[in-house]
Amino acid sequence: MVESLPDVTFQIAAVTEMSPRLLSMMRYSNVVLHPNASHKQLDKLYQESDLYLDINHHNELYKATRTAFEHQLLILAFSETAHGRDYTAPEHIYASQNYPAMVAKIKQVLGNDQAMQEAMQAQKAQANTLTASELADRLQSLLGGNHV
């Protein structure tokens, strides 16, 4: 994926030391590694990112997928590694051998605001979330009158 998306910076963080295999990713100019990342560093990465790739083959740490959702990052995952299916739209989950489809989705949403908005809407629908105004509208229709 890194080679297929040379204009995308991949920020890869771990709260521990990184394996030699992961460290070898430093050879790519669009990869930045963050071994032994602190909570503060992780929070900064969430704030600065547009996407969260749920492709870690090990256990999820610190509710990473939920945190990505709360930071309004588009979440894309591999079916074999998806940790946060409650927050990931089914159409954003790909078989790992079908990574070119994920690459195509990344290119689509990063190059088109409307595509990103539609993808985020699908993600919000999966998580059954509402905006404040949507909640107010629903409460008003349930309660009748102007209670909100």
Range-by-range predicted roles:
Residues S38-S49, E70:
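Short acidic alpha-helix that forms the nucleotide-activated donor recognition element
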Residues Q47-E60, L73:
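Acidic donor-binding loop of glycosyltransferase active sites
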Residues P20-K40:
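Nucleotide-activated donor-binding/catalytic signature segment of Leloir-type glycosyltransferases, i.e.
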Residues S79-I93:
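Short acidic/histidine- and often glycine-rich active-site loop of Leloir-type glycosyltransferases
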Residues M1-S24:
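Conserved catalytic-core segment of nucleotide-activated headgroup transferases in glycan assembly
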Residues G111-H147:
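A charged, aromatic-enriched C-terminal amphipathic alpha-helix characteristic of glycosyltransferases
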Residues E91-P100, Q108-D113:
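Conserved acidic donor-binding segment of nucleotide-sugar-dependent glycosyltransferases
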Residues L73-S79:
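Short hydrophobic beta-strand element within catalytic cores of glycosyltransferases
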